[in-house]
């Protein structure tokens, strides 16, 4: 497993990380299979695990804590503070007081540490962000206090979908160590401004949603309708589903012999050296093995 580094993060992490959103609270989650998948990831060299308090109200953090206690390998831990108003994404008019007042930042850092059973997190992230808050000294002081007290090693921001520009001001403050952003074959906008700035500032890039919520993993068809309560029902509405399937069918025609669509999608993200790690969700052992194999296959041929 390749290890990549970013100056501000201060430690190497696996190029293939593990996104833990779908591990708690989903109706079709097999908890025993989840544990096996996590163990398989560690055995394969995955060292970076990204969770959040909002993933099952701390349950996903608990799963990560148990994983850490099962293994002697040094695993890099990342979690996220939920916005106080519990609104995703952060509305453009949202005030810092509504989302991340200082006492809320500390409270949920401590709650995450309790769920994990750890004295310190390698990386804590704001689960939503608006750059209107960038120069507000209240969150800056709160983060400095957490670092001073040894509760976190680094701080990051998780950017709203389709808004890779809505974090540039925060990065320019020099206080941000990592940025999490949607980046995949269909959404390459972070390449324009975000990635170059992160490289300049030494900020780690955590790429999420590499499979476009499943469409690039073969989970979408022209007639599939997701059940009520599944966010993909709204995301893949009739119009978006048709347009996405058109693009997928064009991609499939250009795939080299023997290469699957999910392999191409993951290798596309990993081929960009600006990306420090990519965090697909993996609830099954077969998914872990497939993604590890894609990582080990190396960068895509530039001709693609």
Task: Annotate the PLM regions.
Residues 1-5, 108-110, 164-165, 190:
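Alpha-helical scaffolding within the catalytic cores
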Residues 1-76:
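N-terminal binding-site loop/beta-alpha segment at the start of enzyme catalytic domains
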Residues 6, 18, 34, 49, ...:
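Conserved, mostly hydrophobic/aromatic
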Residues 21-32, 91-106, 129-132:
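Active-site mouth loops of central-metabolism enzymes
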Residues 28-41, 99-116, 161-170:
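Short, acidic/polar
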Residues 57, 128-304:
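Beta/alpha (TIM)-barrel catalytic core signal, keyed to glycine-rich beta->alpha loops juxtaposed to Asp/Glu
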Residues 70-100:
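Structural motif corresponding to the early beta-alpha repeats
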Residues 113-132:
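Active-site groove signature of glycoside hydrolases
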